[in-house]
Amino acid sequence: MRAADVSDWGTLVFEIMSQQTPIARVQPIWLEWMQRWPTPEDVAAASSADIIVAWANLGYPSRALRLKACAATIVEKHGGEVPLTLKDLTLLPGVGNYTASALLAFRHGIRVPVLDTNVRRVLVRFLDGREFPPHTTPSKAETMRADALLPEDGHHAARVSLALMEFGALVCTQLSPSCNECAIHTHCAWALAGHPKDEKRPTPQPYAGTDRQARGRIMKALRTAHFEGTDGLTKRKVLDAARIDGGDRYQPTRVYRALLKDGMIVFNEDTQRVTLPH
């Protein structure tokens, strides 16, 4: 969470969990996580299997293992204290520019631009008259421009960043912006240009029938097995868990091998069972 009484570690965990996951889904899992593992030392010492199970339905469970690696790095290289420079933070596993900037700005009031997808969209529409940013990640020029727009006081700058994030999430949305309700639409370059559409517009990513869904089904089955205290599942049961109506015949084997390669699951040659990593 971004409250003043939350530790640097708690804030970092929250920001990593919030990547690509709605905050409403993150909050209860974050609370349980922080009660169980309140420090980097606790997470570093936990088993990978317990970490993945606690990640629950946040999605993209590889983030859970990166967070464990992040905790281990903080313990080994920073004495268990979360570093507070952009350079050191972005060297941690699973921590990119946005996550690092969010921690510095919202937790410590350090003056740094926080560029999530909402902020980037608001700025490119208002200033450039484009529907969407031209690049997937912020360019150096985009970051420098955002920095120049921030007030000098770091705490004030953080409030501006939060306001832009909320504005983009609630008003200047991705596909259905509420321009008629927008307080600044008379000054917005995109509105003044007649809301021109970009040639390449983002489209909702499908989930049903995809490899991502099949991977999720395998991970859910193994999380359940671990929670129930069993010694994993047979390979056949794992492949059956990945079968989706309408999916191609090779999908279960494909996603099974991908999860093995990514270190998300383990096949024990002695027991001939598939488990979460230890």
Residues covered by each model-derived region:
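Catalytic cores of DNA base-excision repair glycosylases
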Residues: 1-212, 221-233, 246-249
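Residues in the recognition helix of alpha-helical DNA-binding motifs
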Residues: 103, 254-258, 273-277
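Small/polar glycine-rich anion-binding or flexible loop at a beta-alpha turn
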Residues: 235-246, 273
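Auxiliary Fe-S-binding modules of radical SAM enzymes
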Residues: 243-244, 262, 275-278
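Short amphipathic alpha-helical interaction segments
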Residues: 245-260
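A short, conserved structural fragment
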Residues: 260-274
